[in-house]
C-alpha cells in the first residue's frame, strides 16, 4: 500500500525490487512511495492498518511512537533503540500501545523457531542440570560499505552507511549480537546485572568505516555481586575476515552441555 525511506534513491530502488518480485501483484504503492526524514509519517498516515518499521534503528523509537499515536499495529525490526533515552521512550510508547490494544511484534525470529523453543524448554526443565555458564557468538565477516557519491551530504552518507555510525546503529552488540544475548536471557529468564568487557578496531579502521568497533568481548553476570556465586555469560562478536566464525549460543550445565542454535 505504501512505503518510504529517508533517501529517495533507496525508496525507488526498493519499490523496483518489490515490483519485480514473484509476488509483484501484491505491490500496489506506485503513487505512495515517499522519501525524506518525514517519510515515516506519510506512510503511517496513508491509510494503513499495520506498519513495518525496518529502517536503521536510530530512528525506531520516534517512528514507533508516531505509529502508536496514530493507532497502528506494528512490526519492528530489532534493535528497537540504540541508547538509553531511546529505550525509555520505547517503553513508554509500548505502554500506550497496550492501553490501545495494539499488536506489536519484534524481529527476534529465534523466539518463534520451534527448535529453539523446544531446546530452551528442555534446558529449563533440567536436561543438562543447573546452568552454570553460557557462551554466545556473532563472529563473522565485515558488512557492506557503500562509497560516497558526488554531491552527497554528510547526513545522506551516514544514513546510507548507517551500520558504521553509533547514533544510527548502536554498534555490533546492539545491532546483531542482540539476537544471541536475547537467547541467553530467554533461557535464564533474567537479565545480567553486571558486565565488563573490551573492544576496538583492528582491521576496520579506514576513513570510510565510521566509528563502530570490529570486535567486542564481554563477560556478563546474572547476579548482583561480581565475586559471588553466579551464572556468567561469555559473549563475543566480531567482524574480521579469515578467522574463527560462529553465530551460536551454548549452555553448560552441572550434568551436560547444550548447543542451543
Question: Where are the model-predicted features located?
Answer:
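A structured beta-alpha segment of the ubiquitous adenosine-cofactor-binding alpha/beta core
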Residues: 22-53
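Predominantly a Rossmann-like dinucleotide-binding segment in NAD(P)-dependent oxidoreductases
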Residues: 100-105, 110-210, 224-228, 241-250, ...
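Solvent-exposed loop/turn segments at secondary-structure junctions
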Residues: 6-10, 40-41, 57-59, 81-83, ...
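Structural recognition of the beta-strand scaffold that forms the well-ordered cores
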Residues: 1-5, 32-35, 52-54, 75-76, ...
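Beta-strand-loop-alpha-helix segment that lines the small-molecule cofactor/substrate pocket
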Residues: 49-50, 57, 61-112, 126
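N-terminal Rossmann-like dinucleotide-binding module
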Residues: 1-25, 113, 184
Amino acid at each position: 500500500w505504501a512505503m518510504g525511506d529517508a533517501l529517495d534513491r533507496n525508496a525507488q530502488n526498493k519499490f523496483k525490487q518489490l515490483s519485480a518480485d514473484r509476488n509483484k501483484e501484491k505491490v500496489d504503492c506506485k503513487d505512495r512511495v515517499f522519501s525524506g526524514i518525514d517519510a515515516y509519517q506519510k506512510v503511517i498516515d496513508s491509510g494503513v492498518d499495520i506498519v513495518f518499521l525496518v529502517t536503521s534503528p536510530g530512528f525506531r523509537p520516534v517512528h514507533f511512537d508516531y505509529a502508536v499515536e496514530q493507532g497502528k499495529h506494528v512490526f519492528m525490526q530489532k534493535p528497537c533503540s540504540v541508547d538509553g533515552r531511546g529505550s525509555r521512550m520505547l517503553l513508554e510508547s509500548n505502554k500506550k500501545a497496550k492501553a490501545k490494544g495494539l499488536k506489536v511484534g519484534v524481529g527476534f525470529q529465534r523466539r518463534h523457531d520451534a527448535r529453539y523453543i523446544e531446546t530452551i524448554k528442555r534446558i529449563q526443565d533440567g536436561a543438562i542440570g543447573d546452568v552454570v555458564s553460557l557462551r554466545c557468538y556473532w563472529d563473522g565477516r565485515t558488512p557492506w560499505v557503500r562509497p560516497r557519491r558526488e554531491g552527497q551530504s554528510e547526513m545522506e552518507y551516514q544514513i546510507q552507511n548507517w551500520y558504521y555510525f553509533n547514533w544510527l546503529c548502536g554498534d555490533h552488540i546492539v545491532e546483531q549480537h542482540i539476537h544471541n544475548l536475547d537467547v541467553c536471557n530467554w533461557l535464564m529468564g533474567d537479565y545480567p546485572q553486571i558486565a565488563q568487557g573490551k573492544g576496538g578496531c583492528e582491521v576496520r579502521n579506514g576513513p570510510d568505516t565510521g566509528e563502530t568497533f570490529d570486535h567486542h568481548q564481554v563477560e556478563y553476570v546474572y547476579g548482583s555481586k561480581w565475586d559471588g556465586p553466579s551464572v556468567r555469560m561469555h559473549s563475543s562478536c566480531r567482524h574480521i575476515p579469515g578467522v574463527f566464525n560462529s553465530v551460536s549460543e551454548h549452555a553448560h550445565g552441572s550434568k551436560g552441555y547444550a548447543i542451543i542454535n
